[in-house]
Amino acid sequence: MTNTISILGSTGSIGRQTLDVAEQLGLRVAALTANSNVERMEAQCRKFQPRLAVMTEESAAAELKIRLQDTPV
């Protein structure tokens, strides 16, 4: 059984460190949230393949949706 986590503020310093630890421990990432850093969120989504990605800034959410069209996120 794989443990699963969700990370709020994944593009910030603590969120990035948490993702590093999750990767080292082999944890599955179910969800990522961020405010507006679309480039970093896209990279995280492509790497960790969460089921859900949420951006609080509406224009960032729209941009992320376009960028991730080729993924199941």
Residue ranges of predicted features:
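N-terminal Rossmann-like dinucleotide-binding module
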Residues: M1-A53
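Conserved N-terminal Rossmann-fold NAD(P) cofactor-binding segment
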Residues: E39-V73
